[in-house]
Amino acid sequence: MRDTFQLPLFPLQTVLFPGGVLPLRIFEVRYLDLIQRCQKEGAPFGVVCLTQGSEVRQAPATGDTAAAELFHPIGTLAHIELYERPQPGLMLIRCRGGRRFRLLRSEQMKHGLWTGEAEYLADDPVVPVPPDLVPVRVGLQRLLQHMQAQAQPGDELPIQPPLQWDDCGWVAHRWCDILPVSPQLKQQFLAVDNPLIRLELVGDLLARLKIGTGPEAGPA
């Protein structure tokens, strides 16, 4: 039998990768309740990328029913690391991406919140970055060094410790966090099971986008 679990879902127009940082500004009632419950219980929620619909519920032009929301079946657990309530009806949170999962079924509740039954996808094995992909790693190190040099006090960088420079999966995920490409393309990367292949695909994308990589750089 499959080892499945239930989880609340947060459909977004973005893709969260394992180890990635996701800041969110929450003001919809359905998600205020969700986040408050997750924070209280120390439980994660599932981030899934929308294929149709909006992050904020909107009624269609004809009728009073909220516009349909559709999303990819592969998502990532989001663990709340920072939780603030600066005013009533507003939450500011920062999440960290956890394990990937595949939805087996999902259901929208009466108040608009989505829940799903899911199974975990296998965690990436730690695969060292091979010599031919070292420039991809070096490019990311240089980019982080540039971000650190430009950062102002209080700025939060999109790449956070622990830094795992010799891990194909981690390097690929951090590039995917920051690359200016569509959520649909990022979703394809998320679904790749082999971390070495994922990093190779990222390297091919960097070459097409003419984003610089290089053979020489020290660790950030």
Sequence positions of predicted segments:
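N-terminal low-complexity, acidic/polar interaction/targeting segments
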Residues: 1-220
